[in-house]
Amino acid sequence: RIRYKGIVCDRCGVEVTSAKVRRERMGHIELAAPVSHIWYFKGIPSRMGLVLDMSPRSLEEIIYFASYVVTKGGDTPLTEKQLLSEREYRELKAEYGNAFEAGMGAEAVQTLLANVDLEEEVTELKAELREATGQKRVRAVRRLDIIEAFVKSGNKPEWMVMDVIPIIPPDLRPMVQLEGGRFATSDLNDLYRRVINRNNRLKRLLELNAPGIIVQNEKRMLQEAADALVDNGRRGRPVTGPGNRPLKSLSHMLKGKQGRFRQNLLGKRVDYSGRSVIDVGPFLKMNQMGLPRQMAMELFRPFIMKELVKRDLAGNIRAAKRKIDRRDDDVMDVLEDVIKEHPVLLNRAPTLHRLGIQAFEPVLVSGKAMRLHPLVTEAYNADFDGDQMAIHVPLSDEAQAEARLLMLAAGHILAPKDGKPIVAPSQDMVIGNYYLTTEEAGREGEGMIFKDVNEVRTAYQNKYVHLHTRIGIQTSSLPAAKPFTAEQRSRIMLTSVGKLFFNDILPEDFPFLNEPTEANLHEIDNRFFLEPGEDIKAHYAETPILPPFKKGYLSDIIAEVYKIYKVTETSLLLDRMKDLGYDESTKSGLTVGVSDVTDLKEKPEIIADAHKQVATVTKQFRRGLITDSERYERVIAIWNKAKDDITEKLIEHFEPDNNIFMMSDSGARGNISNFTQLAGMRGLMAAPNGRIMELPIIANFREGLSVLEMFFSTHGARKGMTDTALKTADSGYMTRRLVDVAQDVIIRELDCHSDRGLDVTAIMNGNEVIEPLYERILGRYAQKSVFDPETGETLVNHNEMITEDIAKRIIEAGITTVTIRSAFTCNTEHGVCVRCYGRNMATGDVVEVGEAVGTVAAQSIGEPGTQLTMRTFHTGGVAGNDITQGLPRVQEIFEARNPKGRAMITEVTGEVTSIEENPADRTKEVTIQGETDTRTYTLPMTARMRVGEGDRIHRGETLNEGSADPKEIIQVRDTLATENYIVHEVQKVYRMQGVEISDKHIEVMARQMLRKVRVMDPGETDLLPGTLMDIAQFRDANEDTLLKGGLPATGRPV
């Protein structure tokens, strides 16, 4: 209880009560003159302007006292809302006296707003809409929208002008005393002070009956002060504080990433969290992380206290707290028990997809760095060069259960974007397993036959055989669960020492892996078996060695194991694969030295030849046989070919036991272009403006670069750095917008019973397959049954899920088009149904009702965005080739902007009758004779044609190379064609960069892009012509009208 509660001090007016009222009690300023609210006057479109049907410029003149406005015409020739200058006003006043009324400032606007008869306006606008076209119609639709909103909500238009300004509670605009008696205060206090000062001055002036011009000036200043308070900088120059810094107004407090919503309401800093550098924890299991004792102590403090009191190790909470601060031995014992079975969440910024936060069980470690399991680094995109991660402790039982059941790292083996394992071994683990499964011909002990694995181990430990030695083993000694045939069991199996050890880590009943092929994942080939007594050494002398298991194959093994055994067995296999990989890579002793980079003897020859070709091209240019841009293109092509030739020769020269080659071949680190730069030539570089320079860097890093070459390569290096920084921000922003659009797409029901489907074929780019049919149909439901064209056998029934086996059989039957259920043709409102979505990529099972597929889709498209190349790549300003690629192209598609390097679409089906060039205005004219009419299209001279004279062309096809505008496709063809185009284009960009994304994610996004309909004819519905609305609402309105027997509306998708 507070003494003197509720008593108000008579000196300073402060009430005695609890301090928290300083966060809830508000004040207000009663204004001496009304002021307009800048949001309603300055917003786009201006709400005041729409209600009054006046231009924002006229309103500004009235509100800021530049012009008078007639508020009541009376019996004079003046009309309401007519603007008058100071001089005109004086002259008219002299002529008509008080027969008319005019005013200026927010007061006049308030009067005008109060005069608006909303009901009447609605009737008039609806009538106008029936006749109006073009801009007039657009304006009418906007006005009707806002006026109907006023009618529905019961708000009055004159309330857009304020007579009273509220003041937010004092604790939300704090003032703190600094040392030295100065004060630091929130900007809002400054802004409020300006309003109060001007308001008080205005009151005094009005009491004194000051001259009109002074009062007007004061009212304008009050209006400006109120504007600055609500949204500083929206109109005119912002009000600045000390050091010319614009003050943060109420709007700034809410707006953007640092505003109230995104900073404090959607994402808060939380207790029981920490952050530290991460380090690798090779000793951890798949679901564990190493937690430094010091951090554990703080994070689990309340749990430890409770346990200490419970075990009578501390008398009360305060004693327990002291014990923890002293780091007593009791505390350490309790800590071990407390963290058992208590999962924690680890997060690494930027969190681009849902695998950026996963749950682990903590294991106490010494030191100050958190230890992360090496296999989850890929999901987090983490490395150990100083990255930091945040840790959070779920407190409630529900939170812990959720973390355990849904978020444990061991359960996230497949990536949601493409359904491929995301926890595949990398780097050391890959090279270890690669080294282990390598075979070498003629190693010590080749052709020895052993009775079982233990004998092989003994022989290996005693150096009778090498890891790479090819040997034989009695098949009957291998585990009984292995799927060998009876015939194979009775024979000797041919394999290598390392492969025997590798197969030890696989599940008991998994096929014995002897060669990295898809077939071997299901059964082992008979050619690896010999009858007892056959000459094994002679056999080995004739058979070539088998390739080792590379990174991709290890991934395939994991995917196959996951498919058969699901989560638990897969995470155990992953841990065994990791341990084996680390052990073997340590034993292999792989290094990189200068001697691994060998000189290429053919290089001088290739370079000399390229120089000769360049000289020829230059000569042709000097004689005027070719243009400068053709010369440039040819030079670039010559050097690119020279570089490719050198690369090819390099690969031929590499020995299979060259350490660098092994690293790259296994997929552990590095690729061919790194080699070309080390041992071949660096090649062409891009100048800062993105144009490729004609002078290549001929040297490689083994020889060393000259000063000029070094200088050239700095351009490329700088561009690389800036691109990466820009790309990360761009990609993150794109993900945010995608999520925003798609977050309400959820799996709502089992089946929408749609009778439409999507015909899918392989996605091609010219003759190159970008996405094969197999990947497009896998995990989807068939809309129509598919039959084998030869045998007539049913491969898949209507509404049946296409599994790996079915997809394989469809491809083997030579079928090129399959009709599947798709998100495009789904009838479910506000979401998608299970049948139209198909398999959940992250689990490999059918998607469940309630899954937030929209968010998953947005993350799956946004997350690889950082891997896409930035910028458009200019090969020397040749117009035909300036087609956007990479991230900007993806943004261009999703925002439906007019594409750069646009391709013209034909609106008629017919024959190309002529292509005429007009050198004068640098254009080409293409004429197409359709069945009913002839069309002529004008293209730039530089456009690369896809059609020639006499070609037949179909409506909706492109005439020249480039990107079509989806907005044109939707007008010429239909929604489905547009959605299909979007999927194809996005896939092209991602697949070119080697990023795989499942179609269904792009389908979900494309469906959201085409969700709106523009009402063309409202029929007898309540819809307004020209309005944009959601397709579901449009259908509902039509269904209601049809039930009442009225005419339905017609609309056009946009």
Swiss-Prot record:
Binding site for Mg(2+): 383, 385, 387
GO cellular component terms attached to this protein's record: DNA-directed RNA polymerase complex
EC number(s) on file: 2.7.7.6
Domain of life: Bacteria
Co-factor binding comment: Binds 1 Mg(2+) ion per subunit.
Main EC class the enzyme belongs to: transferase
Annotated GO MF terms: DNA binding; DNA-directed RNA polymerase activity; metal ion binding
Matching SUPFAM superfamilies: beta and beta-prime subunits of DNA dependent RNA-polymerase (SSF64484)
Entry keyword set: DNA-directed RNA polymerase, Magnesium, Metal-binding, Nucleotidyltransferase, Transcription, Transferase, Zinc
Catalytic reaction equation(s): RNA(n) + a ribonucleoside 5'-triphosphate = RNA(n+1) + diphosphate
A UniProt-annotated Pfam family: RNA_pol_Rpb1_1
Gene3D superfamilies reported for this sequence: 1.10.132.30, 1.10.1790.20, 1.10.40.90, 2.40.40.20, 2.40.50.100, RNA polymerase II, clamp domain, RNA polymerase Rpb1, domain 3
Protein family according to the UniProt entry: Belongs to the RNA polymerase beta' chain family.
PANTHER family: DNA-DIRECTED RNA POLYMERASE, DNA-DIRECTED RNA POLYMERASE SUBUNIT BETA
Role according to the record: DNA-dependent RNA polymerase catalyzes the transcription of DNA into RNA using the four ribonucleoside triphosphates as substrates.
Name of the protein in question: DNA-directed RNA polymerase subunit beta'
Originating organism: Weissella paramesenteroides
Lineage: Bacteria, Bacillati, Bacillota, Bacilli, Lactobacillales
Gene: rpoC
